[in-house]
């Protein structure tokens, strides 16, 4: 299994390879950037992991990262996209997205059962979920 640090190094190498950024990698990069760009590296991988946990969950009924990310009312940033104001954080997010997309099954899980997360004040439905752990400013939950 790869640690998140090792996976990030792979992402750094992949960033320079032509043709690897497809729609799925782009959607995953956006989700990581808008949801967790200032979080520790494990937090970025946790957002990627939650995204793909949703892809593989029958609850969300979508089979792509773009599908689960753009499902209505799942991620607040999708309702009003903001410009990329921190290029270094975008690049960091893209390295995580690339490494997770191409090598995710070999990355040691950070939040293996998580389907939900939040930062700040929890919403009402969080009380019905099972709390798993906190990474940086995010709390992660399963059903």
Whereabouts are the PLM-identified features?
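Sec-dependent signal peptide recognition
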Residues: 1-11
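Bacterial extracytoplasmic/cell-wall-associated proteins, especially those involved in peptidoglycan
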Residues: 10, 14-143
């Amino acid at each position: 299994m790869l640690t998140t640090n090792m996976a990030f190094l792979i992402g750094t190498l992949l960033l320079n390879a032509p043709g690897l950024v497809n729609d799925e990698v782009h959607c995953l990069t956006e989700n990581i950037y808008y949801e967790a760009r200032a979080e520790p590296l494990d937090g970025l991988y946790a957002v990627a992991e939650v995204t793909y946990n949703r892809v593989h969950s029958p609850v969300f009924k979508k089979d792509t990262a773009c599908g689960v990310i753009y499902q209505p009312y799942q991620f607040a940033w999708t309702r009003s996209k903001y410009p990329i104001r921190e290029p270094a954080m975008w690049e960091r997010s893209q390295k995580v997205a690339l490494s997770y997309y191409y090598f995710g099954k070999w990355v040691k899980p950070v939040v293996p059962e998580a389907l939900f997360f939040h930062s700040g004040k929890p919403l009402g439905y969080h009380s019905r979920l099972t709390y798993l752990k906190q990474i940086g400013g995010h709390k992660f939950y399963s059903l």
